[in-house]
UniProtKB/Swiss-Prot annotation:
Predominantly monomer. Can form homodimers but homodimerization is not essential for enzyme activity. Interacts with USP20 and USP33. Interacts with MARCHF6. One of its GO terms (cellular component) is endoplasmic reticulum membrane. This is Type II iodothyronine deiodinase. The lineage of its organism: Eukaryota, Metazoa, Chordata, Craniata, Vertebrata. One of its GO terms (molecular function) is thyroxine 5-deiodinase activity. The keyword Nucleotide-binding does not apply. Pfam families: T4_deiodinase.
Length: 266
């Protein structure tokens, strides 16, 4: 099959889910607009914030690109895990136990540097401006605390899902982040630190940031968020595309299935 035929087939596969996502965004905007109007009529102080639509040209472009990223991802279940280039981000809760010899912020390393021969590596991809990702960080922290005796954990900070100067989401809670598009590696590491200041992670969890060429994001088809498990340098578990198929409960089930309760409690 020629390259053009493959591209056409992928486009046809993407179109139904793309349009369903557009419908979701339209419904979301309608609900938020009705809520905003109701607050205006009640003269509530909560209406001081600016109302932002999600169904915009920028939003459509981001959603479409996310499906393309997922469709062309290198990572496959049961196959070799891509050894993407990343940079170290110091975890305030962690000691100096990075797999790389250099542990200063911005020190180059690779994703599989954090994988050991015998223990699975749970890799969690996301950014501060992705609400589904940040909402699940307490659950991810719980996983680290419960399973760190039998598994290793790595958080990979990627390109912002909803930068404040791009496809921004309404800042309707105290847990929302205002982060602009990363202009350089320092910006990305700073955004990761901002996330860690709000959501502390156990010292057993290492933190890295994707390079500015987004090579980890592309290889793993992350787009917004994704989680996977690497075991013996192979993909033992590959989570679905975020936000709707991002599921940490499946990670818990995998760990519980592969390790006895006795091992976890040791």
């Amino acid at each position: 099959m020629g390259l053009l035929s493959v591209d056409l087939l992928i486009t046809l596969q993407i179109l139904p889910v793309f349009f369903s996502n557009c419908l979701f965004l339209a419904l979301y905007d309608s609900v938020i607009l009705l809520k905003h109007v109701a607050l205006l009529l009640s003269r509530s102080k909560s209406t001081r914030g600016e109302w932002r639509r999600m169904l915009t040209s920028e939003g459509l472009r981001c959603v479409w690109n996310s499906f393309l990223l997922d469709a062309y991802k290198q990572v496959k279940l049961g196959e070799d895990a891509p050894n993407s280039s990343v940079v170290h981000v110091s975890n305030p809760e962690a000691g100096n136990n990075c797999a790389s010899e250099k542990t200063a912020d911005g020190a180059e390393c690779h994703l599989l540097d954090f994988a050991s021969a015998e223990r699975p590596l749970v890799v969690n991809f996301g950014s501060a401006t992705u609400p589904p990702f940040t909402r699940q960080l307490p659950a991810f922290r719980q996983l680290v605390e419960e399973f760190s005796s039998v598994a290793d954990f790595l958080l990979v900070y990627i390109d912002e899902a909803h930068p404040s100067d791009g496809w921004a989401v309404p800042g309707d809670s105290s847990m929302s982040f205002e982060v602009k598009k990363h202009r350089n590696q320092e910006d990305r590491c700073a955004a990761a630190h901002q996330l860690l200041e709000r959501f502390s992670l156990p010292p057993q969890c290492q933190v890295v940031a994707d390079r500015m060429d987004n090579n980890a994001n592309v290889a793993y088809g992350v787009a917004f968020e994704r989680v996977c498990i690497v075991q013996r340098r192979k993909i033992a578990y590959l989570g679905g595309k975020g936000p709707f198929s991002y599921n940490l409960q499946e990670v818990r089930s995998w760990l519980e299935k592969n390790f006895s309760k006795r091992u976890i409690l040791d």
